[in-house]
């Protein structure tokens, strides 16, 4: 899995600094060549780039400008800080302690993410659920000790996956659970929030241009140094070294979710990690992948999984109600592609696709 994630990061970064088009069978060849032929404008700028493994994925931070190294160093420290704060797998983290003690006064970051998680749950009619963690544990996704739970167990655990049972005071940042068995996981928005924090750091250090790739969660700062938009690959859900399209963006997060990211097979059936809070089982929505493009990395992260759970028809209707906040690329199980009109002029693909209009 680590090698696959690293390959994805290389693919996306290569596209982001190159001018290559959308990918077919020669996508890997094109992007490899592009790494050697990065345009001279980017080469001439002062560049700093670092890679780190955090939040169970490889992350790359790249910045251009006179303060690029300082900005990247500060960004790497911020990634490590947020990982230590939010990880459910680290018993010393704020969230792990909350899950044990069932109440806490949260940090500013933790409180912000809990509040956003609650808001996203309301916004998506429960498709986004930070309280789903006990169900995820039963499936074995956090520990990779995979198993298919029985129906009775899932039915009981779903009673705990209820965001309305989280008591949270936004002013004091005090939080508690109404049910002693409840636990939360902020992983569904943590990387998106982290990329947004890095954008704040880039602004603080006044870098000219920048890009972060947090395990496939991409966010761009300004344009490339030559003034052109970043070209961000939309990864293929069937081959991490290929891509299904390219979107040209500046100052945007581009975040993709799909069942291909984490899954296991039992008795000939594949079970992926995107759990539908309504059923407790992996979502069967007819979608292979969902890509969200937004100014807000936290929102993009949360909606990428939420729209995957909704399925194509509900996702399109949801976007029409929130078209000023994000755009999308949907790929269905039968390889039909749908994109929202807000990115139609900036998206290219070898797939045929239908543009969804807001009206």
What residue ranges belong to the model's regions?
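Mature catalytic core of soluble alpha/beta enzymes
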Residues: 2-359
């Amino acid at each position: 899995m680590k090698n696959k994630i690293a390959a994805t990061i290389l693919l996306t970064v290569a596209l982001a600094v190159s001018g290559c088009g959308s990918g077919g069978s020669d996508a890997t060849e094109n992007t490899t060549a592009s790494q050697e032929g990065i345009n001279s404008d980017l080469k001439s700028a002062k560049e700093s780039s670092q890679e780190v493994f955090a939040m169970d994925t490889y992350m790359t931070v790249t910045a251009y400008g006179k303060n690029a190294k300082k900005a990247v160093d500060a960004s790497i420290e911020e990634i490590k800080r947020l990982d230590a704060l939010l990880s459910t797998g680290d018993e010393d983290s704020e969230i792990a302690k909350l899950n044990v003690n069932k109440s806490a006064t949260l940090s500013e970051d933790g409180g912000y993410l809990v509040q956003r998680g609650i808001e996203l749950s309301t916004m998506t009619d429960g498709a986004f659920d930070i309280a789903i963690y006990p169900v995820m544990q039963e499936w074995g996704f956090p520990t990779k000790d995979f198993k298919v739970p029985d129906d009775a167990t899932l039915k009981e655990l779903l009673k705990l996956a209820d965001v309305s049972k989280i008591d949270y005071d936004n002013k004091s940042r005090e939080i508690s659970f109404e049910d002693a068995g409840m636990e939360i996981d902020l992983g569904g928005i943590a990387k998106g929030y982290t990329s947004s924090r890095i954008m704040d750091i880039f602004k603080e250090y006044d870098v000219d241009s920048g890009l972060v790739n947090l395990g496939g969660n991409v966010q761009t700062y300004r344009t490339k140094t030559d003034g052109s938009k970043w070209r961000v690959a939309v990864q293929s859900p069937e081959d991490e070294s290929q891509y299904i399209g390219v979107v040209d963006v500046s100052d945007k997060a581009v975040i993709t979710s799909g069942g291909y990211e984490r899954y296991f097979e039992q008795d000939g059936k594949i079970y992926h990690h995107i759990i539908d809070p309504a059923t407790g089982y992996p979502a069967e929505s007819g979608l292979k992948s969902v890509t969200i493009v937004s100014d807000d990395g936290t929102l993009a992260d949360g909606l990428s999984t939420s729209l995957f759970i909704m399925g194509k028809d509900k996702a399109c209707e949801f976007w029409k109600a929130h078209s000023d906040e994000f755009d999308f690329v949907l790929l269905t199980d039968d390889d039909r592609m749908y994109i929202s009109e807000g990115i139609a002029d900036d998206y290219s693909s070898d797939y045929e696709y239908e543009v969804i209009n807001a009206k």
